[in-house]
Amino acid sequence: MRKTMIIPTYWCRKTGDPWQEGDAVYDHPTPVDQEGTLERTLVSMKQFSEKDFKLVILICPTTPEVEAAAYEQVLRIVGRAQLNAETYLFTAGDLREITEILRKAGLNDRGVQLLSMFGYSNVRNVCLLAASILTADAALLIDDDEVFELPDFVPRSLEFLGRRVYGDIVHGVAGYYLNSKGQYYDDVRPEPWMTYWDRFGCKARAFDQIIGSGPRLKRTPFAFGGAMILHRELFECVPFDPLVTRGEDVDYLINSRIFGFSFFLDNTCLLYTSPSPRDRQKS
């Protein structure tokens, strides 16, 4: 099975430069004068027992004004990490070149509008595009603020992909995150309003039922965009909805089910996530 891991990394204006009208909005992009968490993610991949995969790092600037600076930062980070993996840097400029090639091949204006690196859903779709270009049978979607703890993460995440389980072919596998406390719950500070809108409590109960109990593999009503493993039959049929600005991961799972694909969560497929407040600034 040909495997491609895609990691989008988000970059914004320098520290102290405010967000401007028209800039993309992400949770915690890295200012281009800082280095963020990407290197930590890449270094944690050195322990992998499975090295037969391609790695694509998708460089996502919040504005064209920081494209060049973001590229230089990522290039330095990748050079220091010295990963033993076939690695590609995918930039907004690369996407523009691909768009022009497809336009000349007959892609209409509506199709061209879908080729964008602005917003989470569009970024996820470019991740799928990169996997398709590299003829991957499996796309592993990972975020740049995660740390791998499992040396066998790659083969573990692919163990059931494409196989029949409970009468259905596994086309999508969701992993999950552990927070700084080693828990799979949202790492949030209690606020008074949560008494009346207990969304984190509801999520915790759902996580206990799906993540915290057996069996290892089970059908899931939720997935996490930075821990999704997709079979080629799925990602070349179902895209992320470009009009969904947040929650694109769960929306993708729902759309996958609508189109007849099965999505499961593997409760042994875990990553640690912890964006560094020292290295990040809110967009």
Predicted regions located by residue number:
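Acidic donor-binding loop at a coil-to-helix junction in glycosyltransferase catalytic cores
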Residues: T245-Y252
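Conserved donor NDP-sugar-binding/catalytic core segment of glycosyltransferases
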Residues: D152-E191
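N-proximal low-complexity "stem/linker" segments adjacent to membrane-targeting elements
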Residues: M1-E50, I57-C60
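Short beta-strand-to-loop acidic/aromatic patch adjacent to the donor-nucleotide binding site
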Residues: A136-V147
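Conserved small/polar residues in nucleotide/adenosyl-binding loops
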Residues: Y272-Q281
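Conserved nucleotide-sugar donor-binding
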Residues: A136, F222-V238
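A recurrent flexible, glycine/aromatic-enriched loop bordering the glycosyltransferase active site
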Residues: Q209-A227
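Active-site-proximal specificity loops/subdomain of glycosyltransferases
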Residues: V78-L129
